[in-house]
Amino acid sequence: AANGVIVIERKRVLNDQLRLTYNLEGSLDVPDLKSYDYLNAEDKLEFERLAGLYNFETMQGFEEYNRKKILIAKGMDTDWMSQPLRSGFIINNSIGVSGRGSGMTYRMNANVRNVRGVMKKDYRNTVGLAMYLSYHVDNKVTVSFQSQYSSVKWKESPFGNFSDYVIMNPYDAPYDEYGKIIKTLSWDMANPLFEAQCGNYNKGNSHSFTNTLSFRWDVVPGFFINGSGTILSSNEAKEGFISPES
């Protein structure tokens, strides 16, 4: 009995025409608030009255209730949940070039991906580049080189958490009659839109670079030497700011 190695080499196409490909993909993300059973301003005020939140034996309790009652009669019914939202989308563009000839194989690709979140001013943009080169001599040597680069830039929405808007009262307006934002609303609740205009931000970016070189040397039939090496480089930066007014 004997052990051996059988090497099967696929016959390569000697020459191949240049190929160019382009792909565009996109999707739309529309917030759906139908699952929220949200009281309107009139029903919310009545619910609070039945719950005994207003002491009508005091002038303060009586005036506070009537103030909200008058606002509702004038049409006040703020849709707080829609305030920080927008329609988001994802757009992905990719282009590639490939070909082969005279023992050389090459591929180059570029990708740009833009993501706009459903929270206002939220985004994440990605750029990717890749290159592959390979040189092959039949039954002798194969050398290949691969390089990849990726860059990501992102920013979180300054509008805070969506849950902060869900608990707001619809009889409260976010702005006064002069268009100025109101910092504190009924029951000493903070206006979440105030934080969004303070200039707070949380953003960052990252970069990564990878180079890989590999080879295979067929010394004699059934015996070969191969090896590879990789160089990695990456960095990430984050930046945040919270205004003293927050």
Report residues per predicted region.
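Residues on the lipid-exposed face of transmembrane beta-strands in outer-membrane beta-barrel proteins
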Residues: 10, 22, 95-101, 129-135, ...
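Surface-exposed loop/interface segments of Gram-negative outer-membrane beta-barrel transport/assembly proteins
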Residues: 14-76, 117-122, 128, 132-210, ...
